[in-house]
Amino acid sequence: KGLDVLEEPLAQHPDMAKLHPQSVNTMRIVTDRVGDTVHIAYIVLKIGRGDGFCDNSGQGGVICRVDEKTGKICSVATDDYFNVYETHPDTGIRFEGYQLPMVQEAVDFARKAALVVPQICHVGWDVAVTPDGPVLIEGNDYPGTDLCQLAPHYPEKQGLWPYYKEILNIK
């Protein structure tokens, strides 16, 4: 339709680029705002594959869980076809235990962003990490909770139920 978007190129942090240099690999940090309190539902890392420049699992990428406290990847990766990867198929980097840069800064950034639009309480913030810090790529008002809850991501087989039970005060 003749509509184009021209954006400044983004250079990701070298530790993010090691995972897959062709794509800008982002953390999806899902926030839930209850009153004035912002909760972190989950964090997944989206990583590209092959020659693709997109990190989205729907475009061939993979996702894995990130531990908010340690900033490390805390699961294997999965794709949209339920395949499980212990290492990145292109770079060979082992997912579980990989230390991501500036996770706490990215979480703080997402918490602040969640307070900007109070009408939207559940948002998935796609945050890239550059050498200078976190950068917002986009906010998604329907971030999806399906792929992030696959059994390889939650070996205790409870998914996000304990989290939502707690923040929504469900007995």
Which residue stretches match the model-derived regions?
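A sequence-composition feature that detects small, non-aromatic residues
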Residues: 9-11, 17, 41, 77, ...
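Phosphate-binding site of ATP-dependent enzymes
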Residues: 1-77
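Solvent-exposed helix/loop surface patches that form functional interfaces
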Residues: 66-68, 78-89
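Short, well-structured alpha-helical interface segments that form or flank functional binding sites
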Residues: 22-24, 105, 122
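C-terminal active-site "lid" helix and adjoining low-complexity regulatory extension at the edge
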Residues: 83-105, 111, 115-120, 129-171
